[in-house]
Swiss-Prot record:
GO function terms (MF aspect): RNA 7-methylguanosine cap binding; translation initiation factor activity
Subunit record text: eIF4F is a multi-subunit complex, the composition of which varies with external and internal environmental conditions. It is composed of at least eif4a, eif4e and eif4g. eif4e is also known to interact with other partners. tacc3/maskin competes with eif4g for binding to eif4e.
Coiled coil: none
Designated gene of the protein: eif4e
Chief localisation class: cytoplasm
Role this protein plays: Recognizes and binds the 7-methylguanosine (m7G)-containing mRNA cap during an early step in the initiation of protein synthesis and facilitates ribosome binding by inducing the unwinding of the mRNAs secondary structures. In addition to its role in translation initiation, also acts as a regulator of translation and stability in the cytoplasm. Maternal RNA in oocytes remain in a dormant state as tacc3/maskin outcompetes eif4g to bind eif4e, thereby preventing translation. During oocyte maturation this complex dissolves and eif4g binds eif4e to allow translation of maternal RNAs.
UniProt name for this protein: Eukaryotic translation initiation factor 4E
Length: 213
């Protein structure tokens, strides 16, 4: 089906184009679309000769749709990262660590992937997670979202959305339900929310879930 050419409602611009030989660019073509929040993308590479903080590096900050895509299309996909690496996307001013003031009373909705899912699901899930964050997809509870992390690990990758207050049940459960739906997870798949305090003090290999959806 042939595209319909838009009508030129400004004959003056056509005359100007003829005289100068240059196309007149509409302001709409270069105006960027602002996001509600400014975001920071971090990269972690596990070098055992360095401290944890020294391994964490700020890549870039952005606050428009166009700058997000410019950054996303410039960096490696999560599935191509070396084992032991992380990407973290957090609101500007919040560092991707439990100790941050905005994180220390919070927790995370955790998605655990098996090895086969790295090829099929990891990049798709992570991009959808980023879309949920920058698009403020959790309605009035988006303010509770701090950021998200993807951990690339040999034994199985993980993706998590971090929230600021694990005791805020309404916000946490709403975020979890929306997130599960956005990822397209089947109803029979259960995802859990863990507080950072429980994760930091766990005695076994698993942390108890505060909430599940």
């Amino acid at each position: 089906m042939a595209a319909v050419e838009p009508e030129n409602t400004n004959p003056q611009s056509t005359e100007e184009e003829k005289e100068t030989g240059q196309e007149i660019v509409s302001p709409d073509q270069y105006i960027k679309h602002p996001l509600q929040n400014r975001w920071a993308l971090w990269f972690f590479k596990n070098d055992k000769s360095k401290t944890w903080q020294a391994n964490l590096r700020l890549i870039s900050k952005f606050d428009t749709v166009e700058d997000f895509w410019a950054l996303y299309n410039h960096i490696q996909l999560s599935s191509n990262l070396m084992s032991g690496c992380d990407y973290s996307l957090f609101k500007d001013g919040i560092e991707p660590m439990w100790e941050d003031e905005k994180n220390k009373r919070g927790g995370r909705w955790l998605i655990t992937l098996n090895k086969q899912q790295r090829r099929n699901d990891l990049d798709r899930f992570w991009l959808e997670t980023l879309m949920c964050l920058i698009g403020e997809s959790f309605d009035e509870h988006s303010d509770d979202v701090c950021g998200a992390v993807v951990n690339v690990r040999a034994k199985g990758d993980k993706i998590a959305i971090w929230t600021t207050e694990f005791e805020n049940k309404d916000a946490v459960t709403h975020i979890g339900r929306v997130y599960k739906e956005r990822l397209g997870l089947p109803a029979k798949v259960v995802i859990g929310y863990q507080s950072h305090a429980d994760t930091a003090t766990k005695s076994g290999s698993t942390t108890k879930n505060r909430f599940v959806v």
